[in-house]
Structure formats: structure tokens, C-alpha cells
Regions:
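The feature captures the beta-strand-to-loop junction immediately N-terminal to the Walker
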Residues: 27-29
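ABC ATPase NBD Q-loop/coupling interface
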Residues: 53-69, 137
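ABC-family P-loop ATPase nucleotide-binding domains
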Residues: 82-159
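Walker B catalytic motif
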Residues: 165-166, 173
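Helical segment within the ABC ATPase nucleotide-binding domain
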Residues: 175-188
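Conserved beta-strand-loop-alpha-helix hinge in the C-terminal portion
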Residues: 209, 213, 217-240
Length: 243
């Protein structure tokens, strides 16, 4: 994968398999390619895939537009959620749900069903009902933006979740709330990829596997104990083993 502006190779020889029902964590130093991986999987512009494949339930997604990938069930929780002035949260989310349903040939979600589900999800995430009437992320705190990302995720019910440093900027209470929402989405039919720098998120979202990404490749894979080791020793020891 290359980034057009700099013609720089970012991911090279990366192999990753996340089975349905599992939560995998990716950790690694800055510049390792963690966010780039999330961008490539979701179809963000500015990146050229020069080889390899990425499949969801056996279907290659790399030639699909971002909205088609979303309709197939891929969801990315952004590290830095953007503001959308003039578009209320509930309008935005209901439009997204029904756009995906249309692509899949399903009936639209009715207003009463949407409102009931929205209230239930908002309550779990400690989101004020008035917040959902405001423009998307406009004037929201960092923690509110992250909780709103999880609200969208729970409303859309994707098949494959990518959380890109969702824990950044969260205090411990907000972190627990976000983790509760993510854990509520764990399901035998759903895979999750959690990208993080810190062990603390993995105290609440227990991964099945932890991968270390460095220089565009996964250099080591282990269980939750690998994240604990990284927290205690840093990346140098693991990087040295892979050298």
C-alpha cells in the first residue's frame, strides 16, 4: 500500500485473519501503519493498493467504493471524529441505516423502531437525548465524540468493526462506557479489530489475539499477555526478537 502524496510504501507483506466471533488487537509504535490499515480496509482515498487482497466473508472488498464496503458491514470508529454542521445526529444515523438497508434490498427502518432503538443505545452509553438532536460532533467534547462513534456502531450493527485508537483522550469513566458498548456488540457472527497504543483499553475489551505491527508487517502474534508485556517492556524487546 502506498500513500499517493509521498509515494511511500506503508504496508508490505501484512497478513491478518480475524475470524467471526473474535476480537483482535493491533499494537505498534507510531508510524507502523496501524491507521493506514484501517483506512485501506474502509476505502479511504489517498492510498493505492499495489498488491494483495482483503476479503470480508470471502468477498474481496478492495475494488468496492467506501459506501459499498459499509453496506457490506464494515465500520470504522475514527481516531478523530469529524464535525458535520447542520446535520442532526439522529437524521444522519437513520439516513445511514436506511441507505445500507436499501443496498441490501431490505425495508427501511420505521421511525418508531429507530427511536426506540436509539433511546436504548443512548441510555447504555450515557448519551443525553438532546445531544442526538444536535449537529454531528459539533461542540462535543472528545469523550462525547467517541461515545457517539460507538452509538453509531451499535445502531448500524456492522459485521466487522474497526476501532482506531478509540481510547485516545478518554478518562477512565468514558473508557469504561465505550468498552461496555463495544462488548455489547461481541457476537459469534461479528469480528472486531481494535487498534490501540495502550493496554488499558484491553483491560476492558478482552482480545482473543494481540498482533504487533511494525514497519508495515505483523511481526509477532500472541494472546492478551503480549499486550501486558508491551506495556511493561515497550516495543524494543519485541522488535529486537523479530530482527
Amino acid at each position: 500500500v502506498g500513500e499517493d502524496a509521498e509515494a511511500k510504501t506503508i504496508l508490505n507483506g501484512l497478513t491478518l485473519d480475524v475470524p467471526a466471533g473474535e476480537v483482535h488487537a493491533i499494537m505498534g509504535p507510531n508510524g507502523a501503519g496501524k491507521s493506514t490499515l484501517s483506512y485501506v480496509l474502509t476505502g479511504r482515498s489517498g492510498y493505492e493498493v499495489t498488491g494483495g487482497s482483503a476479503t470480508l466473508n470471502g468477498e474481496d472488498i478492495l475494488d468496492m467504493e467506501p459506501e459499498a464496503r459499509a453496506a457490506k458491514g464494515i465500520f470504522l470508529s475514527f481516531q478523530y471524529p469529524i464535525e458535520i454542521p447542520g446535520v442532526p445526529v439522529m437524521t444522519f444515523v437513520r439516513t445511514a441505516i436506511n441507505a445500507q438497508r436499501k443496498v441490501r434490498g431490505e425495508a427501511e427502518m420505521s421511525a418508531p423502531d429507530f427511536i426506540k432503538k436509539s433511546r436504548d443505545v443512548a441510555k447504555m452509553l450515557n448519551l443525553d437525548a438532546e445531544m442526538l438532536k444536535r449537529p454531528v460532533n459539533v461542540g462535543f467534547s472528545g469523550g462525547e465524540k467517541k461515545r457517539l462513534e460507538i452509538y453509531q456502531m451499535m445502531m448500524l450493527e456492522p459485521k466487522f468493526l474497526i476501532l482506531d485508537e478509540t481510547d485516545s483522550g478518554l478518562d477512565i469513566d468514558a473508557l469504561k462506557t465505550v468498552a461496555d458498548g463495544v462488548n455489547a456488540m461481541r457476537d459469534p457472527s461479528r469480528g472486531m479489530l481494535v487498534i490501540t497504543h495502550y493496554q488499558r483499553l484491553l483491560d476492558y475489551i478482552k482480545p482473543d489475539k494481540v498482533h504487533v505491527l511494525a514497519k508495515g508487517q505483523i511481526i509477532k502474534t500472541g494472546g492478551p499477555e503480549l499486550a501486558l508485556r508491551l506495556e511493561q517492556e515497550g516495543y524494543d524487546g519485541v522488535l529486537g526478537e523479530a530482527a
